[in-house]
């Protein structure tokens, strides 16, 4: 509905503080977006069965390792299927096969989703307007939204601007 769509868009305006994401990491331990200390945080919403994600995530990691990591940028990667389907084996395999161990990877269990619904808490899909994958956000050190729904090129250009460099063409 239009009101639902408006709610999703209003929940994450540029300049606003991003909603915290409290999920489980690959070791089944709680992990929070707000506890990730970095000058900039890239929040990447993705699905290991998404063809576009399979292409973009290795490219994202290459840019991260070549440039961003040296500027205290961290990547907080959120598994998007939300426990509806069990893609955990594919998720863990993709992380391992592509050596994405420098990132913080998180997911929600079916039970966590059910608890959020029972408490009428909005899902991360609502809070971050996730309608496709991959979806990339850039947050500053205080977790304010600097850019949202960015392409990899836009994200890299925005980083270059933040570091007072010339963006790529």
Q: Could you tell me what each predicted segment is?
A:
Residues 1-24, 34-35, 65-66, 89, ...:
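N-proximal helix/coil linker or "cap" segments that precede and/or mark the start of modular domains
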Residues 110-161:
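Thiol/disulfide oxidoreductase modules built on the thioredoxin-like
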Residues 37-41, 70-74, 100-103, 141:
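Loop/turn elements at helix/coil->beta-strand transitions in domains of secreted/extracellular proteins
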Residues 45-47, 78-81, 108-110:
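Active-site-proximal beta-strand/loop segments in catalytic clefts of secreted hydrolases
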Residues 55-98, 113-123:
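Structural microenvironment flanking redox-active thiols in thiol-disulfide oxidoreductases
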Residues 163-169:
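Sec-dependent signal peptide cleavage junction
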Residues 31-60, 74-76:
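Short active-site neighborhood of thiol/selenol oxidoreductases, capturing the structured segment around
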């Amino acid at each position: 509905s239009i009101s639902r769509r408006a709610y999703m868009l209003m929940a994450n305006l540029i300049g606003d503080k991003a909603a915290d994401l409290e999920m489980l990491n690959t070791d089944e331990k709680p992990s929070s977006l707000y506890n990730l200390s970095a000058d900039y945080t890239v929040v990447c919403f993705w699905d290991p069965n998404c063809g576009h994600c399979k292409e973009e995530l290795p490219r994202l990691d290459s840019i991260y390792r070549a440039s961003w990591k040296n500027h205290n940028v961290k990547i907080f990667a959120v598994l998007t299927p939300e426990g509806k389907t069990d893609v955990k084996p594919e998720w863990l395999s993709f992380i391992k096969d592509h050596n994405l161990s420098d990132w913080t990877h998180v997911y929600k269990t079916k039970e966590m989703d059910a608890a959020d619904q029972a408490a009428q808490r909005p899902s991360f899909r609502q809070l971050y307007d996730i309608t496709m994958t991959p979806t990339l956000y850039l947050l500053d050190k205080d977790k304010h939204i600097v850019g949202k729904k960015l392409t990899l090129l836009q994200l890299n250009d925005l980083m270059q601007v933040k570091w007072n460099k010339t963006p790529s063409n």
